[in-house]
């Protein structure tokens, strides 16, 4: 029994010491030179570094070539841009309990700030961009939404750039075999629907 316990502990230590290829570590160090308490693991085919910087917990994703893909940061409410805090405090959700606040940065996309809220057993996520615009409200949020944070495929990014040259890609999600991409175009939030790489429709609210 002692031998087995010792082996298990040794195995845990080896797992915590995992490091990817040198080119991936170098890309990470170049992007986050002040990172502290770095731990690596693999998720969904990506190399993921969990670390702390300026007292904030981060998780940075890189592909096999060392290209940065995404970073999720766990923020304090006071760290949100002032424009977001002002809009949130004027909203109907201002009295809800703040469970978590995340900043999602992705290659080729604008940063998104997500305020996770709870009140009387109800869960709601508010998605903002840095200028304070609320771009999405998601109720009864599934906690397994990580894949929707990944960047949009390059072919679709190119199509959007050609069709909406001044737009910013905000968010994406897979629903019933179709890809929903939210963009901000001329200050207006629009939803684009794709099947594979084929565009199907674009919709937006008319005030």
Please provide the spans of the model-predicted regions:
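Sec-dependent N-terminal signal peptides
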Residues: 1-6
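C-terminal motif of bacterial Sec signal peptides marking the signal peptidase cleavage site
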Residues: 8-11
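Interaction-mediating elements
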Residues: 16-207
């Amino acid at each position: 029994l002692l031998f087995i316990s010792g082996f298990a502990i040794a195995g845990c230590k080896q797992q915590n010491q995992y490091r990817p290829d040198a080119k991936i570590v170098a890309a990470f160090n170049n992007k986050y030179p002040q990172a502290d308490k770095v731990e690596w693991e693999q998720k969904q085919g990506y190399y993921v570094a969990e670390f702390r910087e300026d007292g904030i917990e981060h998780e940075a994703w890189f592909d096999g070539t060392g290209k940065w893909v995404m970073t999720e940061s766990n923020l304090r409410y006071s760290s949100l841009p002032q424009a977001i805090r002002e809009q949130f405090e004027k909203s109907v959700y201002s009295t809800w309990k703040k469970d978590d606040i995340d900043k999602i940065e992705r290659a080729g996309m604008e940063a998104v700030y997500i305020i996770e809220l709870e009140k009387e057993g109800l869960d709601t996520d508010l998605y903002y961009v840095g200028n304070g615009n609320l771009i999405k409200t998601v109720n009864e949020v599934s906690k397994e939404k990580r894949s929707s944070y990944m960047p949009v495929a390059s072919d679709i990014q190119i199509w959007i750039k050609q069709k909406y040259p001044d737009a910013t890609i905000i968010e994406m999600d897979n629903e019933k075999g179709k890809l929903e991409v939210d963009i901000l175009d001329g200050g207006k939030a629009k939803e684009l629907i794709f099947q594979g790489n084929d565009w199907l429709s674009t919709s937006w609210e008319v005030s």
